[in-house]
Amino acid sequence: MFGGLAAAVAIVFFVTAHEAGHFLAAKAVGMKATQFFFGFGPKIWSVQKGETEYGFKWLPLGGYVRIVGMSPMEEVSPADAGRTYREKKFWEKSFVLLAGVGTNFLLAFGIFYGVGVADGAPGGPTTEVGMVSEASAAAAAGLRPGDVIVAVGGSETPKWADVEAALQTAGPGPNAVRVDRDGELLTFDVNLTASETHAGAGFLGVTPTIGRVDIGPVEGVGYAGRLVWDGAVSTLEAIFRMVRPSSLAQYFGVFLGDTDVPGEIRPVSPIGVVSIGTQAESATFFFTILALVNVILATINLLPLFPLDGGHFAVAIYEKVTGRQADARRLLPIAAVVIGLFAFLGFVAIILDLTNPINL
């Protein structure tokens, strides 16, 4: 319960931090921002402070800052002359546009760095049992998570690779498995089943815990940077999988009640992130998920698709290179398609997270 609440608060904070990046950057270069909202759709609550309205809207799928002159179709009041987005220099526009994603990338980097230095990096599998599969040979014999496998069939197993080798040698059938349980050596008679992936090997039905490797403060910089990069690449790969025609066809099926969507193409809404947060069994896993949320937010917004931040940045580059203002008549259809696509994926994600929650 606490994990879910913490995840919900964190999502609001990360989206707000993203928009605050835009907002503060706009203020720094003299642009006028009239709205700062979390969410989209009908307004829940707002308050006017100075020239900016702050508030919340019903659909928790992001947020926005409205900067005068940023919309190509907006009519600008003469009173705002000199404070509009379109009047500013290229570097000022770029600073404002990239401040949001920069904030999220920095948050992700900071979280990854903190987790890495405090708890280390994932190492290789250990001989400690992390999970026991239901209806497996290990479960029937009485093995538990936390048991350390010392030997299988008379062969000592100081490493997980030794456990796998011993199971390969033992094959299906009765065998003795010795474990260390809280300092006490116990021997279990286990009736190993046949492995479905390794011919001739015995199958115990346990997964190992993953060890941790210590990381120093200096090493943590490179470690966190690699995780941010890997997360961004994985996000792009996931997006490309989601927009394939076969994937989109499956998403349409969700509206007809078919919620059996494969994990590799399943979109996740903030509701799903909160659900994952409630299932987090360690602080390391919980904070890693929060870091990835920031990477995903930043990477999606960097896509060169109008009206995302990356799309606005692409337009700013075009105008800088050509010396001409972008044609609003061409930008608006692109914006309509992009908004429609993300709204569609967002609704699919919400339906899936409500009707077929993610179970870790």
Give names to the regions the model predicted.
Residues 83-84, 88, 196-297, 314-333, ...:
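Functional transmembrane alpha-helices
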Residues 2-79, 293, 300-322:
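Small-residue-rich helix-interface/hinge motifs
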Residues 28, 52, 59-131, 333:
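Internal alpha-helical transmembrane segments
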Residues 114, 144, 150-151, 164-207:
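PDZ-domain C-terminal substructure recognizer with occasional recognition of PDZ-binding tails
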